[in-house]
Amino acid sequence: MDEVLFYVSAGDQSDTKKPAESFAYISSIHSSKQYETFRHAASPLNGTAISGVGLGERIFTSDNKKALVNVYTYGKESIDQRIPIPEALTALHIIHHPTLPHGAEAKGEEFENSLATHDKPNYRVPWLLCGGSKLGKLYIWELASGDLLCVKEAHYQGITRIDLSLCGTFLVTGGEDARIMVWNLADLIAIYGQAGLINETDSSSTVNRSGKPYYSITDNTLPITDFTLNQVGNLADLKLYTASKDSTVRIYDITTKQQLTTFILPQPVTCLARDPANRQLYAGLANGLIKTIPLYKFNQHTSVLEAVGGLDRIITVDQEDPNMLSTFVQHENHKVTKLCVSMDGTNLISGDDAGQVFVSDIATKQTIKSFPSLNFPISDLYVETVPVDLLVNDKIRTDKKHRMMPPLKRVLASADPVDHVLFMDIPQESVNTIISTKVHKDLDWLEKKKMEELLFKNLSDVNSTVKTIDTGANGGHNQQSTANLELKLSKVSEAYTDLRSKHEQLIKEHAKLLDKLAEGK
């Protein structure tokens, strides 16, 4: 396994006829290995979406100046497709297909615990492509068909970032109008077979798609620069962390629609990253510093790890940090544009407006690796852990089954499900499905027994192990041993009784002697 980083820049923003060439790379963060290079790759901040790393995966970048989406395929250096769209986009995000195996829906199992029963097809595309424009419009396309499922006036100004919750329920957008909108994804794309939405008097069967946001956040005063969601499958624990140019980082509970905590920082916050274990946040500032915001704090009086903030508290992050215990200074004098954290939470990857990308050790705050500079502001970072053989597979270079994506349509899709034509490559069922399912069930059984043992021991110092006595072939020997033990016990009892009687007799004689001495006096 290797942990790789995809990084891309915003490219040359000048109006020259021949702008400087820009690149994007996929490199290891633990070694000097560079796996892939993509030429002419550039996008605005948060304007890149990557489906993954390996055979059949794609990279989508929005053009800085034109209404185009450039598509790259893994293993090919140049642009694979240029897809025209209604207007230039400033933010992109892809949504993958739900991965539910047979019977998982009926059993009510969580999707992250489900077991895939089919291999990945050679030709595959993500499920949806979401894009935000400079005018604040939200576009959602179905990539397999190219249908435009949604066009929404989501913000008054340009959209800066789009993201989806891990459970796939909520789509979150942030904009330059200082607002964050939380949408129900099902409401945005549910256009097929909706009773009461089709206008029977209209021959074109137009649909009323005026869906309202689930939650509208208007607490900020300056544009939203970044936000992140904690990766939980349970909606009750879903939290939203936002960053803004008004120098604040805010935490919201999506389910209760309440603001939990506000952190005030000394400089405008340009980007935000979250620890995989939700232990702390990392805020990139406009002056090049990266501040660590702990979400838990050790209470010295009670010796308990307590959550920081809550109940709409306002906490000021101290600007003075002479010992650099909570500050990264690798990008000093350069605005930090993107942040991300490694899988194990030990390394922080950061990029700035000078095109520099560093990997820093979170514990020591030291730089452990630097990547070749892209000379333009870093617009996106993506970290993934993949097998090494997948990165250097020769099949990537000779993928004959690769097909082009359909063009993205400019008009909304019809509400009639008959008009919905979808082409997908469905592979055969995996040969190891039965074996994998059996192994999966065995692991579930072992996990169940482990929890039962934990509950039985009750987390105490009492040893609850039940000892068993073998009553098999050695039954006769055990009976003889029992008889010998009973004989010894009877002898000990007789000796004890004799000793006790002698002791009582001596006590009586001693009492008589004391009485005689008393009478003599």
From Swiss-Prot:
User: Where is the protein situated, by its record's location annotation?
Assistant: Nucleus
Disulfide bond keyword on record: no
Q: Listed GO cellular component terms?
A: nuclear pre-replicative complex; rixosome complex
Q: Which domain of life is it from?
A: Eukaryota
Pfam families hit by this protein: WD40 (PF00400)
Q: Which UniProt keywords apply?
A: Nucleus, Repeat, Ribosome biogenesis, rRNA processing, WD repeat
TM segment ranges = none
| BP GO annotations | DNA-templated DNA replication; rRNA processing
Q: Does the keyword Repeat apply?
A: yes
State the WD repeat positions.
Answer: 106-151, 154-193, 219-262, 321-361
Q: Whom does it interact with, and what assembly results?
A: Component of the RIX1 complex, composed of IPI1, RIX1/IPI2 and IPI3 in a 1:2:2 stoichiometry. The complex interacts (via RIX1) with MDN1 (via its hexameric AAA ATPase ring) and the pre-60S ribosome particles.
Matching entries from PANTHER family are given as: WD REPEAT-CONTAINING PROTEIN 18 (PTHR18763:SF0), WD-REPEAT PROTEIN 18 (PTHR18763)
Membership in a protein family: Belongs to the WD repeat IPI3/WDR18 family.
What is known about what this protein does?
A: Component of the RIX1 complex required for processing of ITS2 sequences from 35S pre-rRNA.
Output this protein's name. Pre-rRNA-processing protein IPI3
What gene does this protein come from?
Answer: IPI3
